[in-house]
Design a protein with these regions (language model features):
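Generic short beta-strand segments
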Residues: 68-74
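A generic structural signal for short beta-strands and their flanking turns/coil linkers
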Residues: 29-31, 36, 63, 69, ...
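Conserved N-terminal beta-strand and adjoining loop/helix that marks the start
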Residues: 1-19, 41, 65, 88-92
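Conserved Nudix-box catalytic region and its N-terminal flanking loop in Nudix hydrolases
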Residues: 18-56
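Nudix hydrolase/Nudix homology domain
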Residues: 108-166
Length: 166
C-alpha cells in the first residue's frame, strides 16, 4: 500500500475546559472539528506557520506559544488504496485578546482557506464521530493520558454532512 506523507504545525489553545477548533471544509477531516494549523510555506519556520495558520483559520493573533511537541498518526480513508502518515508539530498557544480579531477569508473554495471559522469545543463533547485524529490526540493529552506511540485509523470515514454544534 502506498503511504503519503503530510507534515503540519498546529495550535492547542485550551481554556475553561474548551479546546479551540476549526470547522474543516475539505480533505479527509471535512465536516469535523480540527486544530487550527496546517502546512508550511516555502522558507517558513515552524512558528511562522503556526501564527499565519491561526490567523487565517480563526482570525486570532497568537500572543505566545510554548511546549512544542510532535506526534504522528496513520490515516487510511475507507475504500482508498493509500494511507497518509500525518506528522504534526503542536504548540500550546495563548491568543492576543487585546488585538482586534481579523476577518477570516471567505475564499474557501479557491483553496486559500479550509476553515469555516472557529468554535470552542467542550473537551467532553469531542468524539471520533465529530473530530479529526489531531483533536482526538490532543484530547487524550489534555485528559492526562497522552498516547506517545503512533495512532492508526485504518478505515477512516469521511463525513459528508456538517457537524452539529452543541
Amino acid at each position: 500500500m502506498e503511504i503519503k506523507n503530510h507534515f503540519g504545525v498546529y495550535a492547542v489553545c485550551f481554556e475553561n475546559g474548551k479546546l479551540l477548533c476549526i470547522e474543516k471544509t475539505r480533505g479527509p477531516y471535512r465536516h469535523r472539528y480540527d486544530l487550527p494549523g496546517g502546512s508550511q510555506q516555502l522558507g517558513e519556520g515552524l512558528t511562522e506557520t503556526l501564527t499565519r495558520e491561526v490567523m487565517e483559520e480563526t482570525g486570532f493573533t497568537v500572543r505566545s506559544y510554548s511546549n512544542p511537541r510532535i506526534y504522528d498518526i496513520f490515516v487510511r480513508e475507507e475504500l482508498k488504496n493509500f494511507m497518509v502518515h500525518h506528522v504534526m508539530t503542536l504548540y500550546d498557544v495563548e491568543m492576543n485578546e487585546s488585538a482586534p480579531q481579523v476577518t477570516i477569508s471567505e475564499a474557501v473554495s479557491d483553496g486559500a482557506n479550509d476553515s469555516l471559522g472557529y468554535i470552542w469545543m467542550d473537551i467532553q463533547e469531542i468524539t471520533e464521530e465529530n473530530a479529526s485524529p489531531l483533536v482526538l490526540k490532543v484530547k487524550t493529552e489534555l485528559l492526562g493520558f497522552p498516547e506517545l506511540d503512533k495512532t492508526s485509523y485504518m478505515n477512516w470515514k469521511v463525513q459528508y454532512a456538517e457537524p452539529t454544534c452543541s
